Structure formats: structure tokens, C-alpha cells
Amino acid sequence: KSNPCESCSVHTSSKKRRIVVLGSTGSIGVQTLDVVRRHPDKLEIIGLAAGTRAKELLVQAQEFNVAHVALGARNTISAEVLEGLSEQVERASRSEVSGGSFSQGPDGVADLCKIPEADLVVNALVGAAGLRASYETLKAGKVLALANKESLVVGGDLIMPLAQNPGDLMPIDSEHGAIYQCLLGENPKEVSKLWVTASGGPFRGKKRADLERVTPAQALHHPTWNMGAKITIDSSTLMNKGLEVIEAHHLF
């Protein structure tokens, strides 16, 4: 399966596309950074945000020399890591027009969506917290690369009117990213039905009697993908497919 984040770089330009990654320590965020590593002539990371994995965020910020950093969590972060993040921002901010920024809490994450230098925001946040980031990104006139299902499940009627132009919003989770790429250059009026694909998770083919004895450990062991705990459970129960159908309704 191709990296879903490759769709972030489908548009060619002589100018580097400057990217903010929200949820940079999660699976989609890590994949996004891998894409940037392979296309340094086309892509540049200028902002990173994570929830609680401050040490991983610091390593990423140092590697990409990022001047804008945000942590969703306000507590439980060691003083050493906080100092390291502050020092990194100070070093990198000398070359940024708007300076640098390091903040904690949801306001800080939302502010990253409005950095003047940013061209594109990858929203790989988990849960309904991603809705505000999607809204702020589109309101600021940035391209939204969306991997956060809840933005559309919770607020599709709020988000979609802000994405009026082609390319304003690019879905990069695997199912919707695949549909998006299949429809490029096609007339939507000629499409009568869309299929949202599914691996079936770890319990595909199991009999009802087997499912009565399922353990949390089994539900957390996906046969194909290494993902976060919540999305892995949603995959095991197929709850994520319900969310994806709602998301596809708004997108397409």
C-alpha cells in the first residue's frame, strides 16, 4: 500500500511547500515526515505539534530545525524537555520572518495553523480536537491535508463550505486518499457509487462463538498495520468504517 501522505506532494512547484504537521508523533505524522525526508527539494517542515510525546517531538524539531512547536498537554512534561524545545525554537527562529513560537495547550496547536509562512497543514490529530485545527487552517487560507476523521464526522457541515476551491482540502487517510486520487480529472456526475475499502481487522472470518471470547490484547493486534490504540480498536470493531462512510459523504 502506498504511503497516504504522498498525496501531500502531488502538486509540483519550483517553490518549496512549507508544511505544519499536527500530530507529528502519531503514525500519519511519522509517515508525513518520512515523505519530507525523501523530497527535501520540494517540501519543508516549519511547524510541529504533538499531544503528550514531548521527547519524540523534541527529536523531530531538532532534526527538521523547526521554529514553531506546540504541545497539547500542559503538564507531565519534564523541565529538561521543555528547556530543549524552547532552545530549539530560539535557534531556528532566527531565520523565520515571523520569528518562532513554543506553546502548550489547544490554543497553541490552533495557532500553528495560522503561521504566515505555512502553505499546507497536515491534520493528523486524534479525535474531535482536530475539528478546531481544520477550521482554523481553512479560515487562514492554507491547504488542509486531512487525516482526522472527526473533523468531518463532527463538523462536516462547518468545514466543507470553507473548502470551495479544488485542492483546498486533500484527504490523506488511506481510504479517502485513494478515492480522492481516483477521482482526479474525472467528472463526479459520472460516478454512481463509491466503495470504502476495509482490511477486516484481526477478526475477519471469525465465527460468532469465537468473538465472544475476544480479549483486549487480541483486539489491539492488527494483522496489517501498526497504529495507535484507539484507531486499532475501532478497526477491530469496524467502528472506523462507520466514521469513514460519514467522512466520505461530506468529502465526495
Regions inferred by a protein language model and the residue ranges of each:
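A structured beta-alpha segment of the ubiquitous adenosine-cofactor-binding alpha/beta core
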Residues: V81-D119, L125-G130
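Mid-domain beta-loop-alpha active-site segment that forms a flexible
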Residues: D173-A178, L220-F252
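Residue-level signal for inorganic ion chemistry
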Residues: T25, A61, V69, V121, ...
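N-terminal Rossmann-like dinucleotide-binding module
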Residues: N3-H68
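Glycine-rich beta-alpha junction loops
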Residues: A49-R53, N75, S174-A178, W195-F203, ...
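Rossmann-like NAD(P)H-binding beta-loop-alpha module
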Residues: E117-A118, A124-L125, L131, Y135-A140, ...
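General beta-strand structural signal in soluble alpha/beta enzymes
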Residues: V21, L71, F102-G105, V122-N123, ...
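Short glycine/serine/threonine-rich phosphate/pyrophosphate-binding segments
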Residues: G26-T32, A54-E56, L125-Y135, L146-A147, ...
